[in-house]
């Protein structure tokens, strides 16, 4: 998290979607003037939102609204990227999950899964992505906050694993993992 907090406060200080929505609302209501691209200010979606909400603001998923710290990078995504990277380093990513199940149509009963093979690495990547992108849908982050947070967490984890490698007294042949971009790394 230290890497994410450094980027949030010392480098980027990016506003959150909720705050940008407030800027847009204030400009459309002629309460303030911001440097917002004309294409957005003339978008037909604004009239649709205003007619439904009686405001240019969209409802938030969280009653308390967004956190008050900067958006970029997403802390949840950074942690998810780091944890997933460490797990992929220690477990066989190519292991195929035997007899996977999916949720049945009633939402309660498990049914056999018959799609493509599910691997440990693929499922870990999906988990990290779900953790990262879930807060985008809630209006708390921009997509780039999450995708770059995953990459930052991955880089931090690889750096820590590399540092720890030097402290290993036993014969160590390295750890192999697949990065989120599909490239292979040997630590």
Can you annotate each of these PLM segments?
Residues 1-143, 147-187:
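Hydrophobic alpha-helical bundle signature of multipass membrane enzymes
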């Amino acid at each position: 998290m230290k890497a994410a907090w450094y980027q949030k406060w010392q480098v980027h200080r990016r506003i959150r979607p909720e705050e940008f929505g407030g800027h847009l609302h204030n400009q459309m209501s002629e309460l303030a003037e911001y440097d917002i691209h004309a294409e957005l200010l003339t978008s037909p979606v604004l009239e649709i939102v205003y007619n439904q909400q009686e405001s240019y603001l969209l409802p938030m998923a969280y009653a308390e609204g967004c956190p008050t710290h900067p958006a970029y990078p997403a802390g949840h995504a950074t942690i998810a990227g780091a944890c997933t990277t460490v797990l992929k380093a220690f477990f066989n990513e190519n292991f195929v999950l035997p007899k996977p199940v999916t949720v049945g149509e009633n939402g309660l009963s498990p049914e056999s899964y018959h799609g493509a093979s599910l691997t440990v690495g693929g499922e870990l990547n999906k988990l990290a992505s779900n953790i990262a992108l879930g807060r985008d849908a809630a209006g708390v982050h921009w997509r780039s906050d999450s995708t770059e947070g995953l990459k930052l967490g991955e880089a931090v984890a690889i750096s820590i694993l590399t540092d720890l490698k030097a402290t290993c007294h036993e014969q160590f042949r390295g750890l192999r993992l697949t990065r989120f971009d599909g490239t292979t790394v040997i630590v």
